[in-house]
Swiss-Prot record:
Molecular function GO labels: aspartate-tRNA ligase activity; ATP binding; nucleic acid binding
Name assigned to this protein: Aspartate--tRNA ligase
Organism domain of life: Bacteria
Origin organism lineage: Bacteria, Pseudomonadati, Pseudomonadota, Gammaproteobacteria, Lysobacterales
Enzyme class, spelled out: ligase
Disulfide bonds: none
Matching PANTHER family: ASPARTATE--TRNA LIGASE, MITOCHONDRIAL, ASPARTYL/LYSYL-TRNA SYNTHETASE
Length: 588
């Protein structure tokens, strides 16, 4: 139906006859001439219709051109010629196609929005097929496509095996709710959609495949936000006979190559490395954005003897923290803006936010200054590096909570005070805690997942020091986003059983849920490790968008709905009966 793509028509084709197909982007009838911007996936070319006096065929052609509306689907035949008025904004701007024939392949109904408009998100998602025609959406989807293609080429060239793992599998706890699928042939039993291929890829290492990868679809029934969807895609990788640096060095080289190929970005020749403890101490986050130079400063030792009980209580608590965040130029903040920062911190658990504001002339404005002697106050300001024109925020309380809300303030301040440097800041975060304590459940939970190896090989040591145990987990962070997470795995069945026990998973429960894994580990499992990268998140970063929904062809809303297909939707009673499911009225 076509000989060339619209966006690729250029001067080399001048004088030649071409056949094009695409959508009417714009049609302009200027009376004596019609201009049609014809669009396909490669771009736009101008089609010109010039009626010739006394020529019935050209008059009919002009009539067809004048009748065109937005998004009508056309086939156009014509001769390429040089444009009199060059359009430098178009790749095809030096040429035009003089139409000799126009066939309307399909008329478009009146549009809810035009391809060059940017309507509200609900409208975009309801008419996703129209939204995806927009040039910006085409660009972002193509970025994702190029990313996946580049990853496959890179890994295939290095002897990785692309192996599929099951979509219908066993329900195993991995931190989020499973999506459950009734098993029609086994009444009362259910499959689960995989939250990740974690256990299968470990078993593939036991099976001797050595290097595995998969562009894997994963499913988690959890609350949605801009960087989270119910179903998502990850690059899943696993290596046999490796230590942490083997995995990290390989994927670091891979990311440098991929970013260069896909978006022509040169990532750092060597990614910085930071332990989890250092990241939390300096930045209040396990995925710090290193483009923001602001750092948290611990001040517990300087406020232990103050008369401010909020500070003294936290400073004298072994699990407490008093941290300061200096914002250069922050003295310009009004009281209302300071209250806004306090409200932002409250979202992350802060019960209050103390501050010291120093005017350009050195005047102090602070609700906590009265709790300090003159020398102690001066020492505090010196310790945090505060000067005229600055504001210093303080957080006090439990270590983790203070780190969280002060880290959130750091990000907010960095953006609002234009302190985010240009460029790309990759980072390895290592040495994560093995466990964290769940006050509600009164037990340990795995910080990464239950299959991450501890840094110690001795089970007795792990049991005795579970509270402070460090794992062999690692995350790759880019511009404040965790783009990949991995670890060295447990490959000994006795260690895996001990970790289950520390997580409150007894032998009987472990056998019921993970018996297949424990059995596999018993038959000569090699030391192994791996990592998984979020394709959606990396594509969003490459495309320069805040929301992963922009790089997913058919995403869900934050309300977990597909507005285009109207999913989820009720199921007929006979279908439910086939899978032995009965809907009960919601209890009020």
């Amino acid at each position: 139906m076509r000989t060339h793509f619209c966006g690729l028509v250029d001067e080399t084709l001048i004088g030649q006859t071409v056949t094009l197909a695409g959508w009417t982007d714009v049609a302009r009838n200027l009376g004596g001439v019609c201009f049609i911007d014809l669009r396909d996936h490669e771009g736009i070319v101008q089609v010109t219709v010039e009626p010739v006096a006394g020529d019935d065929a050209s008059a009919e052609l002009f009539k067809v051109a004048a009748s065109l509306g937005y998004e009508d689907v056309l086939q156009v035949e014509g001769v390429v010629r040089a444009r009199h008025a060059v359009n430098d904004k178009l790749r095809t701007g030096k040429v035009e196609v003089i139409a000799t024939r126009i066939s309307i392949l399909n008329k478009a109904a009146p549009l809810p929005f035009h391809a060059h408009e940017n309507p509200g998100e609900e409208t975009r998602l309801k008419y996703r097929y129209l939204d995806l025609r927009r040039p910006e959406m085409q660009r972002m989807q193509r970025t994702r496509i190029k990313l996946v293609q580049a990853l496959r080429r890179h890994l295939d060239a290095r002897d990785f095996q692309d192996i599929e793992t099951p979509i219908l599998t066993k329900a195993t706890p991995e931190g989020a709710r499973d999506f459950l699928v009734p098993a029609r042939m086994h009444p009362g039993e259910f499959y689960a959609l995989p939250q990740s291929p974690q256990l299968f890829k470990q078993i593939l290492m036991v099976a001797g495949f050595d290097r595995y990868y998969q562009i894997a679809r994963c499913f988690r029934d959890e609350a949605l936000r801009a960087d989270r969807q119910l179903e998502f895609t990850q690059l899943d990788m696993e290596f046999a006979f490796v230590r942490e640096r083997d995995v990290q060095d390989f994927v670091e080289d891979m990311m440098r190559a991929i970013f260069k190929e896909v978006v022509d970005v040169d990532l750092a020749a060597q990614f910085p490395r930071m332990t989890w403890a250092e990241a939390m101490r300096r930045y209040g986050s396990d995925k710090p954005d290193l483009r923001i130079a602001l750092e948290l400063v611990d001040v517990a030792e300087l406020v232990k003897s103050s008369e401010f009980p909020v500070f003294t209580a936290a400073a004298n608590d072994a699990d407490g923290r008093v941290a300061a965040l200096r914002i250069p130029g922050g003295a310009t903040l009004s009281r209302k803006q300071i209250d806004d920062y306090a409200a932002h911190a409250a979202k992350y658990g802060a019960k209050g936010l103390a501050y010291i504001k120093l005017s350009e002339t050195g005047e102090v404005n602070s609700p906590i200054a009265k709790f300090f002697g003159e020398e102690a106050f001066a020492a505090l300001l010196k310790h945090v590096g505060a000067g005229n024109g600055d504001i210093v925020f303080f957080g006090a309380g439990g270590y983790t909570k203070v780190s969280d809300f002060m880290g959130a303030l750091r990000l907010k301040a960095g953006k609002e005070f234009d302190l985010v440097a240009e460029g790309w800041a990759p980072l390895w975060v290592t040495d994560f805690p093995m466990f964290e304590w769940d006050d509600e459940a009164q037990r340990y939970v795995a910080l990464h997942h239950p299959f991450t190896a501890p840094a110690v090989d001795d089970i007795a040591d792990l049991r005795a020091n579970a509270r402070t145990a460090v794992s062999r987990g690692y995350d790759m962070v880019l511009n404040g986003n965790e783009i990949g997470g991995g670890s060295i795995r447990i490959h000994r069945p006795d260690m895996q059983s001990a970790v289950f026990e520390l997580l409150g998973i007894g032998a009987e429960e472990a056998r019921a849920k993970f018996g297949f894994l424990l059995d596999a580990l018993n038959y000569g499992a090699p030391p192994h490790g791996g990592i998984a990268f979020g394709i959606d998140r990396i594509a969003a970063l490459m495309a320069g968008t805040e929301s992963i929904r922009d790089v997913i062809p058919f995403p869900k809303t934050t309300g977990a709905q597909d507005l285009m297909t109207d999913a989820p939707s009720p199921i007929a009673a006979d279908q439910l009966a086939e899978v032995h499911v009965q809907i009960r009225a919601k209890q009020v």
